[in-house]
């Protein structure tokens, strides 16, 4: 019996829409990362992108537990000497609510070209509107 290996041309990718309202950041991010990788499919192959497209709406209404809203820090660098900037969860969710979920999911995906390709299949929007109605995404309850 031969081991099955998925071929990139034969992979079927579906579109799903996830409502992040009232969801916990980490629990939502792990399920999204799992679906972006394709681990929920029987034909999962580690070196082939077998995952689905995920559209996340209401990213501004996501929450974290405990004191993490004030204590969790997000760092970025401007590229100049001494240019390390930090922002806590509360400020980042006000400034760029999409980035919070993007950063969380990106850290759960493989590092390298395959992980970057998987990350591109996630579309995050702060509000309820998204421009992917033509793809007819199915509602995914997480």
Swiss-Prot record:
One of its GO terms (biological process) is translation. The keyword Methyltransferase does not apply. One of its GO terms (cellular component) is cytosolic large ribosomal subunit. It comes from the Bacteria. Gene3D superfamilies: Ribosomal protein L13. Keywords: Ribonucleoprotein, Ribosomal protein. NCBIfam families: rplM_bact (TIGR01066). PANTHER family: LARGE RIBOSOMAL SUBUNIT PROTEIN UL13M (PTHR11545:SF2), RIBOSOMAL PROTEIN L13 (PTHR11545). Part of the 50S ribosomal subunit. This protein is one of the early assembly proteins of the 50S ribosomal subunit, although it is not seen to bind rRNA by itself. It is important during the early stages of 50S assembly. Belongs to the universal ribosomal protein uL13 family. This is Large ribosomal subunit protein uL13. It comes from Marinomonas sp. (strain MWYL1).
């Amino acid at each position: 019996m031969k081991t099955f290996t998925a071929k990139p041309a034969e992979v079927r990718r579906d579109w799903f829409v996830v409502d992040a309202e009232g969801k916990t950041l980490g629990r939502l991010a792990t399920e999204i990362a799992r679906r972006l990788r394709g681990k929920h499919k029987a034909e999962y192959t580690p070196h082939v992108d077998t995952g689905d497209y995920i559209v996340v709406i209401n990213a501004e209404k996501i929450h974290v537990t405990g004191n993490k809203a004030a204590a969790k820090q997000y760092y970025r660098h401007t590229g100049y000497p001494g240019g390390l900037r930090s922002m806590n969860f509360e400020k980042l969710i006000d400034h760029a609510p999409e980035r919070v979920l993007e950063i969380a999911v990106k850290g759960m995906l493989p590092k390298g070209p395959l992980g970057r390709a998987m990350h591109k299949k996630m579309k995050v929007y702060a509000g309820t509107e998204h421009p992917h109605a033509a793809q007819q995404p199915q509602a995914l309850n997480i």
